[in-house]
Amino acid sequence: MNLNSPLRTVVVTGVGATTPLGGDTASTWESLLAGRSGATALQQDWAAELPVRIAAPAAVDPTSVLPGHLARRLDRAAQFAVLAAREAWADAGFTGKAGETGGSFDAGDGTGRISAPADPYRVGSVVGTGVGGVTTLLSQYDVLRERGSRKVSPYTVPMLMPNSPAAHVGMEVDARAGVHTVVSACASGAEAIGYGIDMIRTGRADVVVAGGTEAVIVPLNLAAFGNMMAMSKRNDDPQGASRPYDKGRDGFVLGEGAGVVILEAAEHAARRGAAVYCEAVGQGLSADSYHIAQPEPTGRGIAAALEQLLATTDIRPSEIAHLNAHATSTPQGDVTELKALEKVLGDDMGHVAVSATKSMTGHLLGGAGGIETVATVLALRHRTAPPTINITELDDEVDPSLVSSRPRPLPGGNIVALNNSFGFGGHNVVLGFRVTDGQ
């Protein structure tokens, strides 16, 4: 495609997830609607001396699902990414790697199923991670210290590389249009999906596997975040610890897992008769340039990202019916985000159903934008906004009409949902998705 051609429409044709709420998309969505928390008290011996002794580990251990020979060569973050990508790829109707069709859109088995995209050079992989293979780095350092250099795994370097998840996902589907890694702290997964959207809009690819992954529930991270006063210390109440918008919120709960979507050019999806979840309209980006670990207090960067999304797409503020908020359960960030959006949307903010799904999943850092995009896409598909749990006493600065402890129906017709992700370093990402009447 000529890069000077008009921007193409992008749609979502597959979703995949492995999260603290379930080992796949269906179980995760069911738990979100039921208002279940994936947080738990850590039982490992090393947790006893930490200031934070709670987390939201993945519901399904990836090593129990992946073949042993593969699992041993992947860091936990890459394991999550591969599992989520496999589910999303199959959900999109693909049954093989790119290029295995020999140029045909028919699987050739008489069912009419789609085998895979015909040209691997039109398929991309973009996976974000905030930290990368830290579990491998720490465990292999222990091996070096305790058993000597000859016992260090020869797979250590490829396992700990931050680009490893994207590379392995790319090899899973034979993606050759480009394999990219976004490392923007807690905005990584969302920015990766935005990058994938742009790859298709500008003609670089027809199909992109995009998302985010993280696996950092280890003593060093828990101690470091705890000492930063960023995490909840409600060690006696793990499931009630993540409480966005509640007056008593005191920080996030660390989670792990991955969320992946299949992005596809609309004409490519139509040609193969693919089922479409929604349109992936675009992204807005900005940077705070304020502090490496503190949010800019006025929310100007958040507002700028939303303004960019509105300026570069055909989204109208009146269409926006749902927001999956970044809302990590920190005292400052939750309210700043809502105020920034209100500045841009004005009265249209009043009909936005806000969901803070981190109240259930915990905060997956670089994986957050991935699983929250999956939740946003499913909210549009089912026209239902998930609840926000653990609000005992709503913050006085939060409009009570915006959030609910129960699932809420979304209106019919053409509606837009936003997914916000912000990261240390001042990274701001706002993704926009649209479902049309009849979808």
Feature-to-residue mapping (PLM):
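Flexible, low-complexity linker/loop segments at domain and module junctions
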Residues: M1-V12, D106-D119, T313-E319, G350, ...
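Short, well-ordered amphipathic alpha-helical segments that serve as non-catalytic structural scaffolds
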Residues: A81-A92, P165, A192, A265, ...
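Condensing-enzyme catalytic core mediating Claisen C-C bond formation in acyl metabolism
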Residues: T9-T13, T40, D236-T313, A321-H322, ...
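Phosphate/pyrophosphate-binding loops at sites that engage ATP/ADP/AMP, CoA/4′-phosphopantetheine
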Residues: A88-D119, A269-V276, A305-H322, V344-D348
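Conserved catalytic cysteine-centered active-site region
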Residues: N2-L7, A41-W89, R122, G132-Y195, ...
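Glycine-/small-residue-rich "gating" segment that lines the acyl/pantetheine channel
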Residues: E146-S153, E191-G194, D198, A215-R271, ...
